Amino acid sequence: MTFGDIQFLWARGIVETLLQAGVRCFVVSPGSRSTPLVLALATTRDIVVHKILDERSAGFFAVGYAKATGQTVCLVCTSGSAPAHYLPAIVEAAHSFTPLLVLSADRPPELHGNAAPQSVNQAHLFPSFSRLFVDLGIPESGDAALRAVTRKVTQAAVAARLPEPGPVHINVPFREPLEPSAIGITSPRPAVAAAPQFVAPRSALLDTETVKS
């Protein structure tokens, strides 16, 4: 198993855990560093994925979708300035008690503090507005590590709904290689523990096409 396979397995575990918690809508602004997350979404059933290239537009689309359906919506982006563009939507979600998750890819620790491109301190980007910040750390091999990360993701999904709905930020750093091997991408879905679900009727999911900017 390559390190790219390990990261892809983690990304799939994250997505599967969110799905178990009732998160079915993902709004993606793709970039290189978020490759494991985007591939995980592409290989997961029973979710709705919207691609919006501009993060500011994506943020407000997600807030509107969450308000219209009552569902938690998950924003997914790459590293650097990308998650910072969500700030106006985060403020809106915080003050309107709208359940919203931000799942940001990040550069690994060794690329921070030495002028590497698209490497900024993504910890606590929204300290005044997010209900919770969770950093998942560099992906590791092994069932115990995967169980630990799924527990943190479950905690984040719950925090977006309770005690009062609002935005939650999940940050996950990835190292290169970002792509899994041919064997890794066809590996079985990771088993994740059942999580508390906050699911509206499936009919509440908006029937909209992928949005592009």
Model regions and ranges:
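N-terminal alpha/beta PP-like core and its mobile active-site loop of ThDP/TPP-dependent enzymes
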Residues: 1-213
